[in-house]
């Protein structure tokens, strides 16, 4: 054994301690996944060596065949996994094995609940890789040397998973990494060739380089020389995406997803496609079953694994799919790109634009198929990724109609509040003569469901979509129509129901408006600069008044988003609409005292603002006027 120098003991990052605690206390019922995780890491290390060796062939140090070896020692109760990939320096080891250098760590830790089943899903999403070794081991040793560094710059890392680790410099002749697991009592089953072989075949058959185990050998007879150790490859060792679809089982696709996405759950859907002709490439795209922690961080790492002629080039190649598809995982293998392609080149290459367009359509087709054939599965997709898909119409004009068809909304058709109504379903239920798609945005389902803006629609039996996500008003600014039918915000402008209003209704509305001209003028004078206009409402049947938004004005949702982010909000004033048939409006019209008329007008205005989900500019004045009115009524 080589002499250790520069030995030091260091503490784990707090988040790592928490993870290790969960591991050591048997969070996983399926312990065998530790081997899948370690093999996946080893495969990544070999991929990185292949890529770096394109420009620095000396890193191959003689060009030994790239492979992963798994061995065991029953007597010592150890399992050893070794790769001849890129390896790690002392600094790499401290960084990668002592901390979690990943965005969203704090959010991830906040979400841990103590519920083992739930937490296993969360940890699965987060991806723990190396730390899974502590599921079966009470001590883990790592010996590594980075390719291209001298043999005396190897590193030895060791930990019992209790809060600290030791690291020392050692001699290591071969580049790459060797991990030795000292199995816990009760985990001896893993120091067995048959067991390890089955685990590798089950989880890692798709890994595109040989995974070797020692060949089973008959024990040497007494006096005979012990034969030299022979190794045999136990996996297919071919890139899964290069095989014909008909030869790949669903289970293989699922295991490959777990490898490429570092996820513990099966994907929701996948699409495997080979393109030949002007462009030649193969893609294997997956839609996950759950959202990652950093889904709403638009600057978080994303993208596909990029291979060029089956040689790994880069992780997180973001140029192949638009930002609103950042949840998609998978690989793309091109025959047309150069092996020395860079991220900067990817952003400017016309070949990439063509591939991006085709891959985007393929994902949308996959989602359409899921929505049509597996509606319950699509509900799960929408719950996890719907808000991100809503970014699509603004980013991807060419596919706007296709994306719109995948959107789901709550509506007045039921009281569940569930976002399950597609635009096609809405139009299929539309009233005869209805040529518009009506919607209302707001802060919450309860607020929009009970909004006075819906009264005339309920009376006439017209369905209205209820939009309550913060992104919705912004989304609708990019959707002008669907299937030839325009969108109408029922809280905006002067409501026109078109053919759904009879000529008699329209004539009656005009006569009432003319009859109430005097009241309109009095209200304008009383409300003054608070409003842009006062008019008789065509929307109301039960409430006395509402506030409408000007046709070109910014809606409440967008105003609140801008205010919250500290941005300047354009000035605008609401339109005050009143219901001439309401008793309160009748009393208001008959009020002789201008002071009392003014108080009542402002109370109605403030109540209309509250019912729209807005906050009052002067709550104290509202309370004062209301108390004054209550005192007068109680006398």
From Swiss-Prot:
Gene (UniProt): htpG
Highest classification ranks of the organism: Bacteria, Pseudomonadati, Pseudomonadota, Gammaproteobacteria, Pseudomonadales
Location in or out of the cell: Cytoplasm
Subunit record text: Homodimer.
Stretches assigned to coiled coil: none
Name this polypeptide is given: Chaperone protein HtpG
Organism in which the protein naturally occurs: Pseudomonas savastanoi pv. phaseolicola (strain 1448A / Race 6) (Pseudomonas syringae pv. phaseolicola (strain 1448A / Race 6))
Principal subcellular localisation of the protein: cytoplasm
Protein role: Molecular chaperone. Has ATPase activity.
Region (A): 1-343
């Amino acid at each position: 054994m080589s002499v250790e120098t520069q030995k030091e003991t260091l503490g784990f990052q707090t988040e790592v301690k928490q993870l290790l605690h969960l591991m050591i206390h048997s969070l996983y019922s399926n312990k065998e996944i530790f081997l899948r995780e370690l093999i996946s890491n080893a495969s990544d290390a070999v991929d990185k060596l292949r890529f770096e060796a394109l420009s620095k062939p000396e890193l191959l140090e003689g060009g030994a065949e790239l492979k992963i070896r798994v061995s065991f020692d029953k007597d010592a109760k150890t399992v050893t996994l070794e790769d001849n990939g890129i390896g790690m320096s002392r600094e790499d080891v401290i960084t990668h094995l002592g901390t979690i250098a990943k965005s969203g760590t704090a959010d991830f830790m906040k979400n841990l609940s103590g519920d083992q089943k739930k937490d296993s899903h969360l940890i699965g999403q987060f991806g723990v890789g190396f730390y899974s070794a502590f599921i079966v081991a009470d001590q883990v040793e790592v010996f590594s040397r980075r390719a291209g560094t001298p043999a005396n710059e190897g590193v030895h890392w060791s930990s019992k998973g209790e809060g600290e680790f030791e690291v020392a410099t050692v001699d290591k002749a071969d580049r790459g990494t060797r991990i030795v697991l000292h199995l816990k009592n009760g985990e001896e089953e893993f120091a067995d060739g048959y067991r390890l072989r089955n685990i590798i075949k089950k989880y890692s058959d798709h890994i595109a380089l040989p995974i070797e185990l020692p060949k089973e050998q008959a024990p040497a007879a007494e006096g005979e020389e012990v034969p030299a150790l022979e190794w045999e490859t136990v996996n297919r060792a071919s890139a899964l995406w290069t095989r014909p679809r008909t030869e790949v089982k669903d289970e293989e696709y699922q295991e490959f997803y777990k490898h490429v996405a570092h996820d513990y759950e099966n994907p929701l859907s996948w699409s495997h496609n080979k393109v030949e002709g002007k462009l030649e490439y193969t893609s294997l795209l997956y839609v996950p079953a759950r959202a990652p922690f950093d889904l709403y961080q638009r600057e978080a790492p994303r993208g596909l694994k990029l291979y060029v002629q089956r040689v790994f080039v880069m992780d997180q190649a973001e140029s192949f799919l638009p930002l609103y598809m950042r949840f998609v995982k998978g690989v793309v293998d091109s025959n047309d790109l150069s092996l020395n392609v860079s991220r900067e080149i990817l952003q400017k290459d016309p070949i990439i634009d063509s591939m991006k367009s085709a891959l985007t359509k393929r994902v949308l087709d996959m989602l359409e198929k899921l929505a049509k054939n597996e509606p319950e599965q699509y509900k799960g997709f929408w719950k996890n990724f719907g808000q991100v898909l809503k970014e699509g119409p603004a980013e991807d004009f060419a596919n706007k109609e296709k994306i719109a068809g995948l959107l789901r909304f709550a509506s007045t058709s039921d009281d569940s509040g569930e976002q399950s109504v597609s635009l096609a379903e809405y139009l299929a239920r539309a009233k005869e003569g209805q040529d518009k798609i009506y919607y209302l945005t707001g802060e919450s389902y309860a607020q929009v469901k009970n909004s006075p803006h819906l009264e005339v629609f309920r009376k006439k039996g017209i369905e209205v979509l209820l939009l309550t996500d913060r992104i919705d008003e912004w989304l609708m600014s990019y959707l002008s129509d669907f299937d030839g039918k325009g969108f109408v915000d029922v809280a905006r402008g002067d409501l026109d129901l078109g053919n759904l209003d009879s000529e008699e209704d329209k004539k009656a509305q005009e006569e009432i408006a003319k009859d109430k001209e005097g009241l309109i003028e009095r209200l304008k004078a009383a409300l003054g600069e608070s409003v842009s206009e006062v008019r008789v409402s065509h929307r109301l049947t039960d409430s006395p008044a509402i506030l409408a938004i000007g046709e070109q004005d910014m809606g409440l949702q967008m105003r609140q988003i801008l205010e919250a982010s500290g941005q300047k909000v354009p000035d605008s004033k609401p339109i005050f609409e009143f219901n001439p048939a309401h008793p309160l409006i009748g009393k208001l019209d008959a009020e002789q005292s201008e002071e009392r008329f003014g108080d009542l007008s402002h109370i109605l205005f403030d109540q209309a603002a509250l019912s729209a989900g807005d906050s009052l500019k002067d709550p104290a004045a509202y309370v004062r006027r209301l108390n004054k009115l209550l005192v007068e009524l109680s006398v």
